[in-house]
Design a protein with these regions (language model features):
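Periplasmic peptidoglycan-binding/tethering modules of Gram-negative envelope proteins
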Residues: 1-50
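Periplasmic OmpA-like peptidoglycan-binding domain that tethers envelope proteins to the cell wall
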Residues: 54-123
Length: 123
């Protein structure tokens, strides 16, 4: 699972905006859970902020499969944030599947960067 930071942006200082997944997986890694804990802490302090969790996949697989996988990934992040007290009415889920790659390469490193869920401020 990709753990680099070259594609990461930040919701706030020290709060990364994205988590990464293994191939064909929507299970959160230890690193992903740590990032989401930071996001939850920031969201609790900023209770007026709503977010969209954007699920993404790499280029392999059909459009339909990757849209469903992206949705499962975003929902995994949503469920985890909710366990830390973030209300579901503050979180929207959207899947882009393979339509918005952060790296357009066709190799294992590019694919690992594209298997992600990105947290975006909605307001």
């Amino acid at each position: 699972v990709y753990t680099g930071t070259d594609t990461v942006e930040y919701l706030a200082s020290g709060v990364p905006d994205r988590v990464f997944f293994a191939t064909n997986e929507s299970v959160l890694t230890t690193a992903s859970r740590e990032t989401l804990r930071k996001q939850a802490a920031w969201l609790r302090k900023n209770s007026d902020v709503t977010i969209v969790l954007e699920g993404h996949a790499d280029e392999r697989g059909t459009r339909e499969y990757n849209l469903a996988l992206g949705e499962r990934r975003a929902n995994s992040a949503k469920d985890y944030l909710m366990t830390y007290g973030i209300s579901s009415n503050r979180i929207s889920v959207l899947s882009y599947g393979k339509e918005r790659p952060v790296d357009s390469g066709s190799n294992p490193l590019a694919w690992s960067k594209n298997r992600r869920s990105v947290t975006v401020k909605a307001n």
